[in-house]
Amino acid sequence: MKLSLSPPPYADAPVVVLISGLGGSGSYWLPQLAVLEQEYQVVCYDQRGTGNNPDTLAEDYSIAQMAAELHQALVAAGIERYAVVGHALGALVGMQLALDYPASVTVLVSVNGWLRINAHTRRCFQVREQLLHSGGAQAWVEAQPLFLYPADWMAARAPRLEAEDALALAHFQGKNNLLRRLNALKRADFSRHADRIRCPVQIICASDDLLVPSACSSELHAALPDSQKMVMRYGGHACNVTDPETFNALLLNGLASLLHHREAAL
């Protein structure tokens, strides 16, 4: 699996791996790259079955497989210890990595994540699946911003959204791959295993997230032994895109604090 690695800013700089959500594209993290690359070696990638890692996914594709193939690719690139920043599905992959490779994951940052899918989130995905089946990729892509961004943010950026729709449609991961990745997301349940995650965790959520209620992050916080939670008052599901200044400050402060905390505990 192809990875994109930034040059380390100094010798032995910590590694931060960015894992996007259901869309799977590493470019999702563009608003974070410049600030992170000043302090860390940053790893981005298109998830298997998407972007520049095309593949046909098995029907039983799982979050555990997503975690295993990423860890193997990192080890092949010479990276054995790393912090993980995951958004939504990416946060699930991050938790799986922390469970399966505890010696490798130094810190986990969960952005609008959850223990198991909330009834409201499931309802949103049911509607989106119906759109996919009835209207195809175009209907899926055109509806997606409604679940990602605040209404006023979208209204002020209509030309940008039209351009993003065209790009997303041109690089659509395919109906079968999308549904198999979505099914993996819906099957994931960390409610019985979260207390085994021993690395420090930063939880970031947006109170106005339409897709994933912020209560899901509160449940995560209660279940994870060594976690801290930060709430953004504005930003929607893609809060790192809509309010990168606020998000980046939270992320940079959290990573610095938790990595120091981890080193001090060793």
Curated annotation (Swiss-Prot):
Pfam families: Abhydrolase_1
InterPro entries: AB_hydrolase_1 (IPR000073), AB_hydrolase_fold (IPR029058), AB_hydrolase_sf (IPR050266), Pyrimidine_utilisation_RutD (IPR019913)
UniProt keyword list: Hydrolase
EC number annotated for this UniProt entry: 3.5.1.-
Catalytic reactions of this protein: carbamate + 2 H(+) = NH4(+) + CO2
Any one GO MF annotation of this record: hydrolase activity, acting on carbon-nitrogen (but not peptide) bonds, in linear amides
Kinase recorded as keyword: no
GO cellular component labels: membrane
Record GO biological process: nitrogen utilization; uracil catabolic process
The protein's role, per its UniProt record: Involved in pyrimidine catabolism. May facilitate the hydrolysis of carbamate, a reaction that can also occur spontaneously.
Family, as annotated: Belongs to the AB hydrolase superfamily. Hydrolase RutD family.
Name recorded for this polypeptide: Putative carbamate hydrolase RutD
Organism the protein comes from: Escherichia coli O6:K15:H31 (strain 536 / UPEC)
Lineage: Bacteria, Pseudomonadati, Pseudomonadota, Gammaproteobacteria, Enterobacterales
